[in-house]
From Swiss-Prot:
The keyword Transmembrane helix does not apply. Signal peptide: none annotated. The modification 3-methylthioaspartic acid is found at residue 89. Residues 1-28, 101-124 are annotated as: Disordered. Residues 113-124 have a biased composition (Basic residues). It comes from Crocosphaera subtropica (strain ATCC 51142 / BH68) (Cyanothece sp. (strain ATCC 51142)). The keyword Transcription does not apply. PANTHER family: 30S RIBOSOMAL PROTEIN S12 FAMILY MEMBER. This is Small ribosomal subunit protein uS12. Part of the 30S ribosomal subunit. Contacts proteins S8 and S17. May interact with IF1 in the 30S initiation complex. Disulfide bonds: none annotated. Belongs to the universal ribosomal protein uS12 family. One of its GO terms (biological process) is translation.
């Protein structure tokens, strides 16, 4: 327990908050270029082929980002927008690609939850 004199000499240091998405550099989204598009398998007990991409960001970082939804048109040199948000069963994947912006097209034939997958309202 410090004395009052010690507290006057040097105040208590605030605990620094560690960000969960450092590559965004405090921005809500970042633009980047895909360097590799591939599939990977999740941790136990899940089993699938999850679509992910290595993305070189404008902030200088190279990160792994998840491609949500069924089917995608991304390939090497595609320009994408990424947001924060990890994928729980893929270690090291802390970002999501935003569908329906830049080169990432929205999910085809999506009827519900369209805004999350960049799909326009279907004509009736």
């Amino acid at each position: 327990m410090p004395t009052i004199q010690q507290l006057i000499r040097s105040e208590r240091s605030k605990a620094k908050k560690k960000t969960k998405s450092p590559a965004l550099k405090q921005c809500p989204q970042r633009r980047g270029v895909c360097t590799r598009v591939y599939t990977t398998t999740p941790k136990k007990p899940n089993s699938a082929l999850r679509k992910v991409a290595r993305v070189r960001l404008t902030s200088g970082f190279e990160v792994t980002a998840y491609i949500p939804g069924i089917g995608h048109n991304l390939q090497e040199h595609s320009v994408v927008l990424i947001r924060g948000g990890r994928v729980k069963d893929l270690p090291g994947v802390r970002y999501h690609i935003i569908r329906g912006t830049l080169d990432a097209q929205g999910v085809k034939d999506r009827k519900q939850g369209r805004s999350k997958y960049g799909t326009k309202k279907p004509k009736e």
